[in-house]
Amino acid sequence: MATVTDPRDIILAPVISEKSYSLLDDNVYTFVVHPDSNKTQIKIAIEKIFSVKVASVNTANRQGKRKRTRTGFGKRKSTKRAIVTLAPGSKPIDLFGAPA
């Protein structure tokens, strides 16, 4: 990904699942990110958007599943996910908009 002016172009959405929800206690957050972004860009974007200190970023490319439809087969789109670990002492990210 070339130069991006807005960090919100890199971080697309948080992943809300049972596994990602259980990792919130360990200050580990999961986001869907732009497929061309790298770990450094993801770290800078998270730090700018949420004003937190990031300790590490792990990424995973997930292939889209082949799904059967009424008229044949289709394919879900592939996504890239970032698993972000916050530094110790960093404030938690409020993903759900409710008091903790």
From Swiss-Prot:
Function: One of the early assembly proteins it binds 23S rRNA. One of the proteins that surrounds the polypeptide exit tunnel on the outside of the ribosome. Forms the main docking site for trigger factor binding to the ribosome.
Quaternary context: Part of the 50S ribosomal subunit. Contacts protein L29, and trigger factor when it is bound to the ribosome.
MF terms (GO), sorted A to Z: rRNA binding; structural constituent of ribosome
Lineage, uppermost ranks: Bacteria, Bacillati, Actinomycetota, Actinomycetes, Mycobacteriales
Assigned protein family: Belongs to the universal ribosomal protein uL23 family.
A single GO cellular-component term on record: ribonucleoprotein complex
Organism: Mycolicibacterium paratuberculosis (strain ATCC BAA-968 / K-10)
Keywords carried by this UniProt record: Ribonucleoprotein, Ribosomal protein, RNA-binding, rRNA-binding
Gene3D superfamilies: 3.30.70.330
Biological process according to GO: translation
Family annotation (PROSITE patterns): RIBOSOMAL_L23
InterPro entries in the record: Nucleotide-bd_a/b_plait_sf, Ribosomal_uL23-like, Ribosomal_uL23/eL15/eS24_sf, Ribosomal_uL23_CS
Protein name as catalogued: Large ribosomal subunit protein uL23
Disulfide bonding pattern of the chain: none
HAMAP family: Ribosomal_uL23_B (MF_01369_B)
